[in-house]
Amino acid sequence: RGDMHRHTDLSWDGNRDGTLCDAYRYALDAAAFEYLGVADHQAGETDYTWWLTQKAVTLLTVPGRFAPLYGYERSLSYPNGHRNIMFAKPGVPVFPIPAAERQGKEGAGKLFEHLRAAGGISMPHTSATGAGTDWRDADPNVEPLAEIYQGYRHSYEHQGAPRSNPKLLTWCRRTRRRRSGHMIRRPRRSCTARAEKPA
C-alpha cells in the first residue's frame, strides 16, 4: 500500500503539501505506507532539488518496511503532459527537458532513452486535463503505468468519479480529437450539457 504522487513545498504548487519530512512522516506513521513516490514538479531538472529529494529517500528508507522511491514530476503541457519519473536507486543524473519537447514539437523519446539507460519508469497523469499526454510515444517498457487516481487532488477514472471535477470538459474534448484508449466518444454538445447539469 502506498502513493506514487505526493508533492512537497519543493513544488511550485506544493504550498499546501508540507515539507519532504512531513510527507515521509505521514507515509511511515499515519498512513502506514509500504512505499511513497514524492514527485515534486521539475525536481529532477535542478541539481539541488534532485539531490535533496534523493538524500531524503536514502535517509528514510526502512528495509523490509518502507521503500520510498527516487522521483520527480516532469511537467509539460499537452501533448507531452505531466509524468511522474521514478527510480529504484539514487545517483541518476538530472535530465533537462529538451526545448523541442517543451514546445510540443517532439515527444518523450529522449526521456524514454534516458529511463531505459538508468532503469527508471514514467507514469503519465492528469490525462483528463490540458496537462495530459497524447500517448504518441507509448512504450510499455518504460511507461508501464498510468495514474488514474490521485489521493489528494482530482480523479480521472471517469466523469462523476469520487473527487472528479464536473467542470473538466477536456474529457470530452480529448476524446473527440484523439484516440485515447477506452474513452467513450460523444458529441461536444452532449458533454457540455452533462457538465453543466446540476448535481
Model-derived features: where do they sit?
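Extended, charged catalytic domains and RNA/DNA-binding interfaces, predominantly
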Residues: 1-199
